[in-house]
Amino acid sequence: MGDTAVEPAPLKPASEPAPGPPGNNGGSLLSVITEGVGELSVIDPEVAQKACQEVLEKVRLLHGAVAVSKRGTALELVNGDGVDTEIRCLDDPPAQIREEEDEMGATVTSGTAKGARRRRQNNSAKQSWLLRLFESKLFDISMAISYLYNSKEPGVQAYIGNRLFCFRNEDVDFYLPQLLNMYIHMDEDVGDAIKPYIVHRCRQSINFSLQCALLLGAYSSDMHISTQRHSRGTKLRKLILSDELKPAHRKRELPSLSPALNTGLSPSKRTHQRSKSDATASISLSSSLKRTASNPKVENEDEPIRLAPEREFIKSLMAIGKRLATLPTKEQKTQRLISELSLLNHKLPARVWLPTAAFDHHVVRVPHTQAVVLNSKDKAPYLIYVEVLECENFDTTNVPARIPENRIRSTRSVENLPECGITHEQRAGSFSTVPNYDNDDEAWSVDDIGELQVELPEMHTNSCDNISQFSVDSITSQESKEPVFIAAGDIRRRLSEQLAHTPTAFRRDPEDPSAVALKEPWQEKVRRIREGSPYGHLPNWRLLSVIVKCGDDLRQELLAFQVLKQLQSIWEQERVPLWIKPYKILVISADSGMIEPVVNAVSIHQVKKQSQLSLLDYFLQEHGSYTTEAFLSAQRNFVQSCAGYCLVCYLLQVKDRHNGNILLDAEGHIIHIDFGFILSSSPRNLGFETSAFKLTTEFVDVMGGLDGDMFNYYKMLMLQGLIAARKHMDKVVQIVEIMQQGSQLPCFHGSSTIRNLKERFHMNMTEEQLQLLVEQMVDGSMRSITTKLYDGFQYLTNGIM
């Protein structure tokens, strides 16, 4: 990608010749491009085809299989045949391309026929425009994905596939579902363009490899079973799960069997001893031995050393959820969950991680008494907290040694000494390896967990055993802030307000025991769990949490996350102060996955059930009277988040909006969860909820009523947000449109899904017409009888208030 964008000649209708040669800077095409890729449709397809074919041919002729990146370093790849090759990041096009363009311009000017000269000038300018677009700073990852999907020319596709190397990893990762879905369901030219990048990244990142393998399996599941076995997606998944893509400098030889394998340690000893930190191959080795011993006919597929522990860890978490679903009562499910996780702790620490986290780490412990089974009628989703130790590099850092639970007290005593009482040598010793005593024990054996009989730990009344779905956040480091000087009177006033309006605790409810734990502040939860952990004294200790779901297809949730993330980025770019909270989704298969819990939040259902107050009275109870700083801040947060989610619900047609699926956090924001019914799907396909979004009279009361300034501010935000979103409609629509390819998801039922989505952006309306539309949607949603009926239906059938 060049340092400066070259401005081409102004775009003219195809029937008119360009006013000058390609280098003319009298006008700029870039202003047109900013309105979306769709504006470029005026370029002659034949000209575009020729230009891109020339680009591809020049790449082949000038560079062959050798390439360098923007910094002059070669990029090592594996091509479609698994053979090492290299590819160039075409940030700066070869000089020969520019020289030929100049020659083309010279040829045009030397022609004798005026009509031929004008036609050649026009074609040359259009070719230059397309190439300059690809080279310009405006050519971002969203535009690249759009051209990769819409273009039918191999030259364009190959060029875009090569340009993927020029974007930041984080930017490409956002579109990973789209890239893999195109690889599975589109033609070979698209797949050939995408594969080198995927293979290259899999060599660099173990977490990227895992996510690719999981998504390839999930998005291939809609194919017929006979087709699926031989599909490109299945073949690429097998390649990723093999050691072929493991970086050469990190490949480890399979360790020899430990003497412990031959000494026949008793199960009790093996249960409480750890393996050598790097001998994780014992997991895959023992698994293979167990499979072949029990069924000699089963083909022995070599699992990759680096992915086997993580895959078994995930499988065991999913198996726990499936077994919990067979139990009749929530109390039995909770006791069984605690028992299962207690056994799982005997296999930790290990070379496993939580894929939803944003930093490298090793899982060392699961505080099992803090786990909770979440509310669900037919299934058993559950939430766990996970203690991890952050590390610089997951692959090269040794797995920490296990610290027995009985060392917690002494560890805490040491921690209370000055400077934590731990020398540098002692800290380093915490990560030392221990002998491998459990090579012959399958590290994540689900069957063994099911067979063992374990005494259930006593349920402590003061422990936060239960917590509602989406009710915690991940621990983050506090940012350093400059000192702020406040008058003593302000300090006294704020302290008195804080003491007078401390958040209230919920009472224990046998039908919803999670409500009590919900009110515990996250930092307090972290402190309490850390004090009870044998690893809590370590400086790199962190607490994470994750929701494990079995029996639910999270592919629609992932699609909704992407749309919310894109809208969030658009509103930030356009400086519209709307607030939404996208939470991470990990799709494990077509019927299982993991969800990142949200910041301290309770559902509106729990608020109303526990407090027996209206939403406004609850705000007053939690944040103080109308004129306090805390209330005004919470009210503004409520308005900004309500407007943001109303637009999300309208654009995506989100259904099933009962009060159990709307959370309220400690700062006053509302957060919508559970996007299982979007676009063309609705609960039981009844299409019962007909309003554009959910806006109840209680919501309006919190805003200050229909005549209040905050209600007018809410409608203004709605208008500004819709105007900003439609400026970038293509970025939102392409996320959905690409995922429709080859999909059997309910949200894509019907042929008009994408057309209806585009219509909801109202591209043909003026801003005055949009303002009238917003007024009509707000008024219709407040008066919607179907919203009231659906809330009543949920109360009668599920007890949701």
UniProtKB/Swiss-Prot annotation:
CDD domains: PI4KB_NTD, PI4Kc_III_beta. Residues 259-268 have a biased composition (Polar residues). Its cofactor is Mg(2+); Mn(2+). It catalyses: a 1,2-diacyl-sn-glycero-3-phospho-(1D-myo-inositol) + ATP = a 1,2-diacyl-sn-glycero-3-phospho-(1D-myo-inositol 4-phosphate) + ADP + H(+). Belongs to the PI3/PI4-kinase family. Type III PI4K subfamily. Residues 520-786 form the PI3K/PI4K catalytic domain. Residues 672-696 are annotated as: Activation loop. It is a peripheral membrane protein. The modification N-acetylglycine is found at G2. Interacts with ARF1 and ARF3 in the Golgi complex, but not with ARF4, ARF5 or ARF6. Interacts with NCS1/FREQ in a calcium-independent manner. Interacts with CALN1/CABP8 and CALN2/CABP7; in a calcium-dependent manner; this interaction competes with NCS1/FREQ binding. Interacts with ACBD3. Interacts with ARMH3, YWHAB, YWHAE, YWHAG, YWHAH, YWHAQ, YWHAZ and SFN. Interacts with GGA2 (via VHS domain); the interaction is important for PI4KB location at the Golgi apparatus membrane. Interacts with ATG9A. GO terms for biological process: inner ear development; phosphatidylinositol phosphate biosynthetic process; phosphatidylinositol-mediated signaling. Its EC number is 2.7.1.67. It is found in: Endomembrane system; Mitochondrion outer membrane; Rough endoplasmic reticulum membrane; Golgi apparatus. Phosphorylates phosphatidylinositol (PI) in the first committed step in the production of the second messenger inositol-1,4,5,-trisphosphate (PIP). May regulate Golgi disintegration/reorganization during mitosis, possibly via its phosphorylation. Involved in Golgi-to-plasma membrane trafficking. May play an important role in the inner ear development. Pfam families: PI3_PI4_kinase (PF00454), PI4KB-PIK1_PIK (PF21245). One of its GO terms (cellular component) is mitochondrial outer membrane. Keywords: Acetylation, ATP-binding, Endoplasmic reticulum, Golgi apparatus, Kinase, Lipid metabolism, Membrane, Mitochondrion, Mitochondrion outer membrane, Nucleotide-binding, Phosphoprotein, Transferase. The gene is PI4KB. This is Phosphatidylinositol 4-kinase beta. PROSITE patterns: PI3_4_KINASE_1, PI3_4_KINASE_2, PI3_4_KINASE_3, PIK_HELICAL. Residues 653-661 are annotated as: Catalytic loop. Residues 278-294 have a biased composition (Low complexity). Residues 1-29, 101-121, 250-304 are annotated as: Disordered. Residues 2-68 are annotated as: Interaction with ACBD3. The lineage of its organism: Eukaryota, Metazoa, Chordata, Craniata, Vertebrata. Inhibited by wortmannin. Increased kinase activity upon interaction with NCS1/FREQ. It comes from the Eukaryota.
